[in-house]
Amino acid sequence: FEVIEDVKNARSALGIIYFSRFNESVLSGVLAENHLLFTRLFTAAPHVFLSSGHPLAGKERVTLEELEEYPCLSYEQGEYNSFYFAEEILSTVKRRKQIRVSDRATLFNLLIGMNGYTICTGVISRELNGDSINSVPLSADEEIRIGYICRKGEPLGTLGERYLELMRRHIPQDDAIA
């Protein structure tokens, strides 16, 4: 929710969010109320990030059942913690072990140190993260539509355009919108 507020209040020129079957109608309404526009960048199937030493890291695909014994890591949602605004898809699935973190560095450290996992798009930058994190497809009947939001009728500006240009270098090109 904070990213929507930041863009609405012009603290940010753009923000990155995702739509899923679960959250699309709620988020679309919130964006319309706040005069914000969603532009899709790409669509992805759910993946999990695992440490390269995780027992499931070498599998071609994993299931939620296989992940059950490992801690699921997710981001704290701040003051507005409705599950419609969760940063991870499948956020309503009950998990035996759940750890909430506030930043990416902590999440990756716990992925490695505790054999945890997080559900994600599967997009990872090797130049930023090295080889310590693997992305493995998750067997789930879901899709994630990732895009950016901006204020309707306002240009992104030089910095916003440059950010999107750099971001597009790391997204799946077969599905990306140029």
What are these regions, as identified by a protein language model?
Residues 1-6, 155-158:
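N-terminal winged-helix
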Residues 2, 8-13, 18, 77-134:
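Hydrophobic hinge/microswitch elements
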Residues 4-5, 39, 65, 108-109, ...:
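Alpha-helical segments flanking ligand/cofactor-binding loops in enzyme cores
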Residues 20, 24-25, 56-57, 64-93, ...:
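Secondary-structure junction motif
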Residues 26, 32-39, 44-45, 105-154:
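Beta-alpha-beta core module
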Residues 30-72:
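Flexible hinge/capping segments at coil-to-helix
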Residues 53-62, 140-142, 153-159:
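Short helix-loop capping/hinge motifs at secondary-structure junctions, enriched
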Residues 65, 145, 149-178:
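Extended ligand-binding regions for polar small-molecule ligands
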